[in-house]
Amino acid sequence: GISLDGIGAVHDKFRGVKGSFEQAVRGFKLCSEVGQKTGLRLTLTRNNVQCMDQILDFIDANDIQRVCFYHLVPTGRGVEVQTLTQEEARNAMDTLIARVEEWKAEGKNREVLTVTQPADGIYLLLRQLREGSPLAKETLNLLQWNGGGANSSGRGIANIDTQGVVHPDQFWQSVTLGNVKNNLFSDLWD
């Protein structure tokens, strides 16, 4: 996926490079021209949450089929970026859910994920139950299947860092399962 940090000047300011948004847009267009499926990745922060509608418009206008919205996990450079308040996170989810429902009604089947916040699935389920959505049962089944997203670490996904060290996922760098330079991955993962 191609990373965006907002639309236009918001992206450029975060990246510290004027014109970097246009370079990302060019990347999407070039991938599309050669038939390369390309997704969009964006970490929600206080610096870009106000662009949510514009980001969703961009996704629609560029016919992007897979989108990952990450909730900020403040580490490294992210420590300096403000995480969303609970209200901002819920508003972002409401905006996202409403747009996905519009896309679905229009026959646009996009894969939209939210990452690093297992509460998003529960929030969606509670909203569906409140609205009497026929999708609530399917959502509940998916949440039960993957443990709400919290149980996939070390089971459904793994992270192998640049040194060959195996971690339960990309966010559990403090937990080491071994090194693929010394052991077969299948021995470490079994």
Cite the ranges covered by each PLM segment.
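Short, small/polar residue-rich loop motifs at catalytic or cofactor-binding pockets
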Residues: N151-G154
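Anionic group-transfer/hydrolysis microenvironments
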Residues: D5-I7, Q163, Q170
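Short, electropositive alpha-helical surface patch
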Residues: V49-R66, G121-N141
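Short, P/G- and charge-enriched loop/turn segments at secondary-structure junctions
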Residues: L142-G147
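A structural motif corresponding to the C-terminal end of an alpha-helix
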Residues: R26-T38, N62, T95-E111, T162
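C-terminal accessory region of radical SAM enzymes
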Residues: E88-E138, V165-D190
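Radical SAM/AdoMet-radical enzyme domain recognition
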Residues: G1-E87
